[in-house]
Amino acid sequence: MSSNSHYFDLKDYSFKETPKGVRVFWTAMKYVVLVIACVLVIIPLITVLIGSFKTKTELMNTSAFILPKSMAWVNYARAFTNGRVLEGLGNTIFIVVVSCAGSIITGTMTAFVLQRFNMLFTRLIKAVFLATSLLPTITMQISVYQIVVKLGLVNTYGAPLLLYIGTDIIAVTIFIQFLDNISVSLDESAILDGCSYPRVYWSIILPMLRPAIATVLVMRFVAIYNDFYTPYLYMPNHRVVSTALRDLTTGSNVSWNVVFAGVIICIIPTLIMFLSMQKSIYSNLVSGSVKE
């Protein structure tokens, strides 16, 4: 940067040139924020885990952080039987697996068409996708519910499956952004070698979208697994995880130790999903593409 210049040029400045004391301070602040965030997340989980092993009397008369005198495993058995948690887990896993698979297939296909084919209304369709994602979901529920009723899908698995697969606008947006970084020359080379567009999609595009698929998979899994409104409204006679936990809290004499046990049971699949997918998300987030 010129000595005669009165303006600050970011190109001539780097974090390494800051005083050592300032670097140490900001590094320490980052770790302090991370520790505080971890504590805020972990403390509620610890209290729920401890409470799930207490008796009802012990839970009401002791501190949330005091360990139980004996492990009340019966709370977990009661959560499975009284709250129909096992039924809810089975229904939820079925809905999640089918919905995630459908979202990935329809999302990648839609993104492939919108990003690769310069049709007349491509930009308009993208704008409509973005605009609809900004609308509050609750504002469309009356018309959506009427459509579901006319299709005869109330109290069936078809209603949540149709809604989860057909309204995944965020997944389409993520796939389009990843496709922007994949060279079109790969498609052209494959077509010159005799590949059809479905073969290009299946053999080239889909494998290169693995980082985006992993990200969407985790997002959709958590969103669908935790959703209460859709299954409660469209399939009230079938239990999922969220509605099964609600059943444990109904009535005048709620056993919160059993509720805590149900919460821990329902957390386990989400935890397993994240731990199994985090390596793929973090290590492959910016890989797998050729830029022009």
Language model regions located:
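A structural signal for multi-pass alpha-helical bundles of membrane permease subunits
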Residues: 4-11, 19-22, 26-292
